[in-house]
């Protein structure tokens, strides 16, 4: 940094005298007023400043690798390869949050740290809540991923989670539209149609009862905790409100739900949202 190293010749001479010949890669915070000796000692001893690695709203592991590789030295290919080569890796291990890493973290070290963070996240309290619902942590994350894609309104998440838990208890298909969009791989869909429900996929929760085989995104902490603290009620259906506010209206039976769904369909037609 030209703001710190005022005299390059002086810095190089000091480095030569001290015997500092190699530059070790990393993320270092250089402070104004540092002497050449202070700077060289910091670089030689590898006193890095951690970088904050942030990821959220992630659809899949490939997107995760791309997002993380923008923030540490490891490239997206090495991260993706390391994940695929580790059979013990579950997408659920990567919980969206803000983490601290050294910039020169490699792919294997990144995965190791994320596993440790996953174990830390799933403390005794969360595990006990999952067990009360007869769900494994991985299953909680799968359901949370659906909840996450159903609503952007955090306040609604526990109620929506409660609907799906009620359906699971009855062994009903979840009939979750976001799982169809995931199966189709078309995230431009704004209106799920009957033809979409015919896709042959284990992620089609209209055809297959129970949870899909994996998460449809990396669920947020808010969604995971919404499942673990789901609202207890007698709702089995929900539909987006016809004011298109992003909120939902809930129903206890199919007749009530059909009336709500018809209002929503009319609203979509009014706004010319056909697909």
Where are each of the predicted segments found?
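Conserved catalytic or metal-liganding residues and their short signature motifs at active sites
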Residues: 1-186, 201, 217-222, 226-234, ...
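C-terminal, helix-dominated tail/subdomain
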Residues: 184-215
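Active-site-proximal loop/helix segment associated with metal-binding centers of metalloenzymes
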Residues: 238
